[in-house]
């Protein structure tokens, strides 16, 4: 990853090895990473050369790349330690994940850690033109007061239009309505889907930690965790482990980090969409092969 920024990253391998001499409990088991589908990358023709070191060289799957979950585990543990240290210093965070698989996880992780978040459309200028965004927040607050009074003085049609406008403002602004200053660290779930957010963060010198799949350049952000960024289970696991690091400094319970496998519930299988179910079925044979290799 972008190791030149030494105030943010150093050596994941060195940090994890040092920790594991103190405790044999990993931040999350490889079995749980397999269950989450964290190893499943994109089609081979979509790969980015800078992700080569994180891809399993053996041809376990003819069509798609397989991410090395040993490295996923190491980089995730390092990211957890990094976030914990930053949170202990009072650093502020913003979680960003606007695609379907990430929305719910990002919102819930941010809310339980009292962090900012964007889970709907990223509004241009959220970080680079914050005064305009805050004017929208002010407008939302004004409409809230009118709504509390039943939109008194407005016709039924006008009230319906104002309520529709208010609902849209809440959808886009609820996660940043309490932003009094710019966040210092961004946690992002998809480098492609949320590239505008990343561009704005870099302009404002906000540090970025995120999930990097096989189709992206990991050096675009300050620290990346190699993993599947399309599976809701993978996103859920990784984002909540990072949120646990913040929660720990707030004296709150850890949900996923350093927990037994049977205590980690990734998602309700009935909530999975057909596209994700198909992806998981396709990955099943690969998972079996990886499990066999890990046990050898």
Curated annotation (Swiss-Prot):
Keywords: Ribonucleoprotein, Ribosomal protein. One of its GO terms (molecular function) is structural constituent of ribosome. Pfam families: Ribosomal_S2. One of its GO terms (biological process) is translation. Residues 1-24, 270-296 are annotated as: Disordered. The keyword Repressor does not apply. GO terms for cellular component: small ribosomal subunit. The keyword Membrane does not apply. Belongs to the universal ribosomal protein uS2 family. This is Small ribosomal subunit protein uS2. It comes from Mycoplasmopsis synoviae (strain 53).
């Amino acid at each position: 990853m972008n190791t030149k920024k030494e105030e943010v990253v150093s050596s994941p391998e060195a940090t994890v090895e040092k920790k594991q001499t103190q405790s044999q409990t990993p931040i999350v088991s490889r079995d749980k990473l397999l269950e989450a589908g964290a190893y499943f990358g994109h089609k081979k023709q979509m790969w980015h050369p800078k992700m080569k070191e994180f891809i399993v060289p053996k041809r376990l799957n003819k069509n798609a790349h397989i991410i090395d979950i040993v490295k996923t585990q190491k980089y995730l543990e390092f990211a957890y330690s990094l976030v914990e240290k930053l949170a202990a210093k009072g650093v502020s965070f913003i979680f960003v994940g606007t695609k379907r698989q990430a929305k719910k996880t990002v919102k819930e992780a941010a809310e339980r850690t009292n962090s900012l978040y964007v889970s709907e459309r990223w509004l241009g200028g959220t970080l680079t033109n914050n005064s305009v965004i805050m004017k929208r927040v002010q407008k939302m607050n004004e409409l809230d007061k009118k709504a509390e009074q039943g939109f008194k003085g407005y016709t039924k049609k006008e009230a319906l239009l104002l309520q529709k406008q208010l609902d849209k403002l809440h959808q886009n602004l609820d996660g940043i309505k309490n932003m009094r200053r710019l966040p210092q660290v961004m946690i992002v779930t998809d480098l492609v889907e949320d590239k505008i957010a990343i561009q704005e963060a870099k302009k404002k010198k906000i540090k970025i930690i995120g999930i990097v799949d096989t189709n992206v350049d990991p050096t675009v952000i300050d620290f990346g965790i190699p993993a599947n960024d399309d599976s809701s289970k993978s996103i859920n696991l990784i984002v909540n482990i990072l949120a646990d690091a913040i929660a720990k400094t707030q004296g709150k319970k850890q949900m996923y980090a350093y927990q037994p496998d049977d205590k980690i519930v990734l998602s309700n299988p009935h909530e999975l969409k057909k596209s994700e179910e198909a992806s998981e079925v396709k990955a099943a044979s690969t998972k079996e092969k990886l499990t066999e290799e890990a046990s050898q």
